């Protein structure tokens, strides 16, 4: 087998990150994500998930992110984390090379007990999503009917942040972050309130450009507020110093000059990072996608019964990878369908 360090795609990009979705379901209805009401049939079993993670580690991944939908809706989350932790502690197991296990959640189900359970089960990092501070805006971004419902939702998310911090997820160590999708004309007025909130909470805020993932959200380019515009607006209130984007990373990071922490911006529309993208996405039912903006995936289930066969399939899939959709967006937008965000797991 080719050494993991030599496994690269057609553009010399290594495989380093696995994003594994546990469910396509969500308890919110964010219009940019459009989650499913039910999971697809034939969800991967715990054994299949572990086999996939083990193979991915053998092929070079060092980071695993568990996503959804809302992953806290999955009854398999804790058993999976516990099994991963046991493997990471076993001499000679490929999962010993796993440097971090992270989770993306909307935070509404992140109680004190849940956060403690996740930490004790071996979770290293949590990213919580909140797209505004004002109740009416939060309601609009989360598919809730009223501003009162939006206020209630925001309180739950902030409670989830507090629970994660109490459970030992340290923002200063990058173990707890806040994500926000920004859509021009919808929640762009929440930039400063969100930044103020994150500074007050001591967590890094990561602002995400509104992306053309899926077909249900009726995305248009004029709805995108660019990362540069976001930074300009925040910098006018709090001076910023550029930190940069690490190779293979998604966020361009900035440091508040006054010591108020860090800010990240993910500019997949205005400043694509296809050139060093190192992520493989696998859905809850075992479809592998080499690009967030892909239209079709590769079904891994026929190979999931045998680790050697799965290793060959994933390695071949990655070697043949030539995706750079964001770089080619102007030529391809509108001409091909995309898999939905909640199905892909972001």
Curated annotation (Swiss-Prot):
Binding site for S-adenosyl-L-methionine: 32, 69, 129, 211
Transmembrane domains' residue ranges: none
InterPro entries found in the cross-reference section: Aldolase_TIM, MoaA, MoaA_twitch, MoCo_biosynth_MoaA/MoaC, rSAM
Residues involved in [4Fe-4S] cluster 1 binding: 26, 30, 33
Cofactor: [4Fe-4S] cluster
Keyword match Lyase: yes
EC class: lyase
GO molecular function: 4 iron, 4 sulfur cluster binding; cyclic pyranopterin monophosphate synthase activity; GTP 3',8'-cyclase activity; GTP binding; metal ion binding; S-adenosyl-L-methionine binding
PROSITE patterns xref list: RADICAL_SAM (PS51918)
GO terms classed as biological process: Mo-molybdopterin cofactor biosynthetic process
Statement: the UniProt record of this protein carries the keyword Repeat: no
Pfam families reported for this sequence: Mob_synth_C, Radical_SAM
Catalysis: reaction(s): GTP + AH2 + S-adenosyl-L-methionine = (8S)-3',8-cyclo-7,8-dihydroguanosine 5'-triphosphate + 5'-deoxyadenosine + L-methionine + A + H(+)
Positions bound to [4Fe-4S] cluster 2: 274, 277, 291
Cofactor note: Binds 2 [4Fe-4S] clusters. Binds 1 [4Fe-4S] cluster coordinated with 3 cysteines and an exchangeable S-adenosyl-L-methionine and 1 [4Fe-4S] cluster coordinated with 3 cysteines and the GTP-derived substrate.
Catalytic activity, EC: 4.1.99.22
Pathway: Cofactor biosynthesis; molybdopterin biosynthesis
Region span, Disordered: 326-346
Keywords on record: 4Fe-4S, GTP-binding, Iron, Iron-sulfur, Lyase, Metal-binding, Molybdenum cofactor biosynthesis, Nucleotide-binding, S-adenosyl-L-methionine
Start and end residues of each Radical SAM core domain: 10-240
Signal peptide segment: none
Residues where GTP binds: 19, 65, 104, 177, 279-281
Family: Belongs to the radical SAM superfamily. MoaA family.
Protein function: Catalyzes the cyclization of GTP to (8S)-3',8-cyclo-7,8-dihydroguanosine 5'-triphosphate.
HAMAP family, sorted: MoaA_B (MF_01225_B)
Protein name: GTP 3',8-cyclase
Originating species: Parasynechococcus marenigrum (strain WH8102)
